[in-house]
Structure formats: structure tokens, C-alpha cells
């Protein structure tokens, strides 16, 4: 998911001086459009809500990057001084409406979903979005609907996911054995960093969805793992380019573009050979080959599955494990549920079909996604027609960003939102239902967005996270890497919301 980000705080101060130096030189050449479907600089008929005072050229960037805080935190704090929505200005992007209220977020994402179903994406992303011809990049319309339906009814459909259950279980056994081997490696003292192992397990799973249940190519798994990382790293300066388009002339941005092109070529070399292989019915490749899309478009529609699925799933899983290391009582409660269920079924491991029957496991996954939504600002929405929002007129082409983090941390909706409490999502448990009615809780829990532009792979993503967490907790007791050294829960925002310091934990095999 290409979520809304602004300029990296570490780069911002250096760029401010450059911006003013180049302003006079390039003023006549600045393009105000931003990527695909860019909104006009200021749709004249929009009734903009109040917002913090802005500076010329940079808008509100000086406030968003102040103190090194991540943007979703800063926007949540700024929103406390304004109404349910505010206007934020970001360089060449011009103004956008930022929503931090649960009711208003529901209006944008669900109630008036068709009105806000357009996309605003970064300039560099067109290289990986088949020139904006992928599920995440399309504005809502017939092409988007056809592609999304093919993805959800085929590879992401329940029948196809269930058909690979045996392979999925083998993935979990391989993951556990790999972690065991890493823990026993000389000098590790039982300490492992699970992120890399979870990434590989996720790529194997996604590869079978894309290419069929029998797909088994470890060289491809390794290559795709590297390609996803290189893509994210190569596009790291994309938001500098979007916010200040004249920076395209700077060496650092030009190098970023060249690295992006190199990553694109690597992806093509990985995926292109697979297009000539037989495509099993139900696989994503089978569906894509049935369309009239050119080869280049098929390649990057496949890559979209990995780009959106690998880091989001792996990061959410490691966040969950970090919370369980920090909350041993919750970990033991989860293990007891898993052990009792396995004993009742005479099983040693948790299977995909079991996940929906394990209420505390689901609570752990949902609470993790509440606290660490993988894209805390979601993907920027664009109005496709004139509409109303919070009683104000919003013109077609207006950018609207929903701060999911602010909604998930509203103490009026979620008592003690900073506390990890899986019981919020367990009906009948103490603190269940988030302290409110289940219907309202549904409207204020939006880790995948909502409405017609909700994440197409959310059910598969939740299943994969639950499967990995369940089998790793069933197999190991997770402890701090050293006595008294709890995981660092500081955040880092690259392509998705990740742990700033990757989780390292000591694992002890359970009897």
C-alpha cells in the first residue's frame, strides 16, 4: 500500500536551504501536478476547513517535520486544535483535507466511498504500477473493478486459499525449523530476528496465489525478497520529488530515479520467465493472461501483490510478537488457548481452518493492527466528483487523507489506547468491544481502510499474520533478548509502519 507520507525528517532541514536556492532558478518551470490524477493546486469551489498557518512554498512542512516525530503522530496532535477535519499544505501538492475523526473517516471511506474513490500517487510509483494500471493505482471505474474482482474471486478467494492449506502448513513447519536453527546457531544464545524469516514465508504463500499451488522456487523467493527491499529503498526520496518537483534536477533525486529504474529491470527479469509457464486455473497469472493486458502490465500487476503484501504482513507479525514479548501475561493467555484447542483436536499445529475459532488469537491480531496500522495515513483519496464533507462543499479533484492512527488512538473510543489489550476484541471478555458498542467499534477500527477502496487482500493478510503468530507462539516461548531488555517499540515509516529497531527476541522451545 502506498500510504500517505511526507518528507523524511532527516532530509527536510537539508532540503529547505536547497529549495530556496533553486526557487528563483526554477520558478517558471515548477509543475504543480503531482503524479497520476493530481488534484489542482487549489480547487476553487472547495470550502476548505481551518488548518494551521502555512509558510510560502513549503506550506506546513515545517510543522510536520518538527522534532523528528512521524507525520501521523504530528497530524493527530495538530488535529486537536481544529475541528473534525483540517487543511494541510505540502509544497507542490498544495492543500489537502486531513480527517482525524471516526465519524468523518467513515463518511469518506464508506458512506460516500464512490465520491472519494480516486487516487493520488507519487511520480516515481508509475514505474512499479504499470503506469498507474494496477488495483491500488486505478481510480474507481470499470477497469479497476474488473481487476479487483479477478484478484478477489481468484487467487484471494476462499476456495483458492483453502486449496493450498497443506502447502501453507508446510510453510509454517519450515518457518519454525528455520527459527529453531537460527536460535541454536553458535553465539546466538537463543536470540533470533524473526522479520527476515516471516518475509520469506509470506513470499512463498503469495507466490502460490500468483503462480499456482505447486509453485516452489526458492531462488525466486530470494530474488523477490531482494526486489521488494530494493524497490522500497530506491523510492525513498519519492516524496521529496512530489512535494517539490523542481528537486528533480538535484543529483540525489536523479540517483534515486536511476536506482528505481534498476529495481524495475530486476523485477522484470524475475517475473518475465514465469509468464511462459502453464498458469493453473485460480492463480492470479491465469486470470491476468486471460485479459488483453500487455506483458509489462502483467509483470507489475503481479509485483503489486508482493509490494503490498510482503512488508505489510511481515511487519504486522513482528509488531504482534514484540507486544507479546512485552506482555508475557497476554502471551501465556494466547498459548493456553492454542494448546487447549490443539489438544481438543488432537493436532500439534494450528491450521488455516482453525484461525476463526480462536478468539484470543484474533484479538491479538486485531489489537496489533489497531495500535500499529500498517499504513497509518492510508492511501490518499481523491474526489471524483463534487461532494459534501462535514457540511462543506468539496470540489472534484480534492485530495483527502484519513489519519487512521488518530482514529485508533482516540481515548473516547478506545480507553487507554496506548495499552496492548487483545480483550478489546473478545466478546464477553473484560474490556471487550473496545468499551463501546460492537457497531460503533466496527466504524472506528479501520486498519485496512474501508468501503470500496479497502485493501483487497485484507482477509488473506489477517490469515497469514494469525497463522504465523499462532505457530510461533505454539512452538516457542518468546522472551526479551536479554533480561530486562524489552523490545524497542519506536516506529519507523518507510513504505509501511515498521519497528525502528527490528525485533530481536530469545526463543525457548515449548515442551
Curated annotation (Swiss-Prot):
Enzyme superclass (EC): oxidoreductase
> Heme: present as a keyword of the record?
yes
Any one Gene Ontology cellular component term annotated for this protein: endoplasmic reticulum membrane
Q: Which residues cross the membrane?
A: 7-27
What family is this protein classified in? Belongs to the cytochrome P450 family.
Function, as annotated: Cytochrome P450 monooxygenase involved in the biosynthesis of aromatic piperamides natural products such as piperine (1-piperoyl-piperidine), the pungent principle contributing, together with several terpenoids, to the aromatic properties of black pepper fruits, and displaying numerous pharmacological activities such as antiproliferative, antitumor, antiangiogenesis, antioxidant, antidiabetic, antiobesity, cardioprotective, antimicrobial, antiaging, and immunomodulatory effects. Catalyzes the conversion of feruperic acid (5-(4-hydroxy-3-methoxyphenyl)-2,4-pentadienoic acid) to piperic acid.
The entry's protein name is Piperic acid synthase CYP719A37
Source organism of this protein record: Piper nigrum
Ranked from the top, the taxonomy reads: Eukaryota, Viridiplantae, Streptophyta, Embryophyta, Tracheophyta
Amino acid at each position: 500500500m502506498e500510504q500517505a507520507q511526507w518528507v523524511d525528517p532527516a532530509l527536510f532541514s537539508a532540503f529547505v536551504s536547497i529549495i530556496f536556492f533553486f526557487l528563483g532558478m526554477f520558478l517558471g518551470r515548477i509543475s504543480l501536478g503531482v503524479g497520476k490524477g493530481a488534484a489542482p493546486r487549489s480547487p476553487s469551489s472547495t470550502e476548505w476547513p481551518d488548518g494551521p498557518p502555512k509558510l510560502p512554498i513549503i506550506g506546513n512542512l515545517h510543522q510536520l517535520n518538527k522534532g523528528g516525530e512521524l507525520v501521523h503522530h504530528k497530524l493527530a496532535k495538530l488535529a486537536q486544535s481544529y475541528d473534525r477535519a483540517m487543511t494541510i499544505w505540502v509544497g507542490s501538492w498544495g492543500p489537502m483535507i486531513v480527517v482525524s475523526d471516526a465519524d468523518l473517516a467513515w463518511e469518506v471511506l464508506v458512506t460516500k466511498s464512490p465520491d472519494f474513490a480516486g487516487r493520488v500517487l507519487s511520480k516515481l510509483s508509475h514505474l512499479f504500477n504499470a503506469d498507474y494500471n494496477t488495483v491500488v493505482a486505478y481510480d474507481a471505474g470499470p477497469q479497476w473493478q474488473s481487476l479487483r474482482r479477478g484478484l478477489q474471486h481468484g487467487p484471494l478467494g476462499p476456495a483458492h486459499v483453502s486449496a493450498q492449506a497443506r502447502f501453507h502448513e508446510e510453510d509454517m513447519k519450515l518457518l519454525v525449523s528455520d527459527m529453531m536453527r537460527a536460535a541454536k546457531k553458535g553465539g546466538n544464545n537463543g536470540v533470533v530476528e524473526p522479520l527476515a524469516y516471516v518475509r520469506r514465508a509470506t513470499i512463498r504463500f503469495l507466490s502460490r496465489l500468483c503462480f499456482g499451488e505447486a509453485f516452489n522456487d526458492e531462488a525466486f523467493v530470494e530474488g523477490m525478497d531482494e526486489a521488494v527491499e530494493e524497490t522500497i529503498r530506491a523510492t525513498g526520496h519519492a516524496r521529496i520529488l512530489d512535494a517539490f518537483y523542481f528537486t528533480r534536477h538535484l543529483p540525489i533525486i536523479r540517483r534515486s530515479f536511476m536506482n528505481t529504474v534498476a529495481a524495475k529491470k530486476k523485477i522484470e527479469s524475475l517475473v518475465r520467465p514465469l509468464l511462459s509457464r502453464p498458469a493453473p486455473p485460480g492463480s492470479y497469472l491465469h486470470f491476468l493472461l486471460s485479459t488483453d493486458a500487455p506483458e509489462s502490465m502483467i509483470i507489475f500487476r503481479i509485483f503489486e501483490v508482493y509490494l503490498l503484501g510482503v512488508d505489510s504482513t511481515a511487519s504486522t507479525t513482528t509488531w504482534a510478537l514484540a507486544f507479546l514479548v512485552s506482555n508475557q501475561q497476554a502471551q501465556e493467555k494466547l498459548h493456553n488457548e492454542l494448546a487447549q484447542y490443539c489438544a481438543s483436536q488432537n493436532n500439534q499445529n494450528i491450521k488455516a481452518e482453525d484461525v476463526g475459532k480462536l478468539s484470543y488469537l484474533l484479538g491479538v491480531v486485531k489489537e496489533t493492527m489497531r495500535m500499529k496500522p500498517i499504513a497509518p495515513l492510508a492511501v490518499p483519496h481523491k474526489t471524483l466528483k463534487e461532494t459534501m464533507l462535514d457540511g462543506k462543499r468539496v470540489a472534484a479533484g480534492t485530495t483527502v487523507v484519513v489519519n487512521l492512527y488518530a482514529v485508533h488512538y482516540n481515548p473516547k473510543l478506545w480507553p487507554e489506547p496506548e495499552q496492548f489489550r487483545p480483550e478489546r476484541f473478545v466478546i464477553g471478555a473484560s474490556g471487550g468491544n473496545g468499551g463501546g458498542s460492537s457497531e460503533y467499534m466496527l466504524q472506528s477500527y479501520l486498519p485496512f481502510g474501508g468501503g470500496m477502496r479497502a485493501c483487497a487482500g485484507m482477509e488473506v493478510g489477517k490469515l497469514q499474520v494469525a497463522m504465523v503468530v499462532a505457530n510461533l507462539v505454539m512452538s516457542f516461548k518468546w522472551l526479551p533478548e536479554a533480561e530486562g531488555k524489552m523490545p524497542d517499540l519506536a516506529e519507523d515509516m518507510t513504505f509501511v509502519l515498521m519497528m525502528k529497531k527490528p525485533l530481536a527476541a530469545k526463543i525457548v522451545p515449548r515442551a
